Amino acid sequence: MSMPNPKKTAVRVQKVRLYPDSEMKQVLDELCDYRRYCWNEALALWNDMHEQSLILDDRKSRPSEYKVRNELVAEKQDWQYALSARVLQLSVSDLNKAFRNFFDNAQTDWGKPKFKSKKAPRQGFKTDRARIVNGKLLLDRPHESRHKKK
């Protein structure tokens, strides 16, 4: 008889169907576009860092989640401050997970992470700061947001 693993934790997920108005649809589209932009920039940077580490044969210059994220934050442009910083952080974290799965020998069916296209039928973003209050979705809002509450 095997004992249950005490380190297992339950993950609470809430799947919600949204019916956004035109303003909220624009905000969601901007967040999806920003996530795709962050993923593609992080992937390009990751590939460059990986090539440099192979050429220089230097283990210290290998890409990591923190190196890539810090580089992207240092190169942030003005328009990016109007959007949630968590989108950038979570997209780099997801890219790190994708590369870990790619290099994991136990998961042979995982392919190398690819650039995301705007033409893809499924667009999305992730946040860990959203709340539902009285049937309304509240997203985290950056300090310099263009979409202020009325």
Task: Describe every region a protein language model picked out.
Residues 1-150:
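Nucleic-acid substrate recognition interfaces
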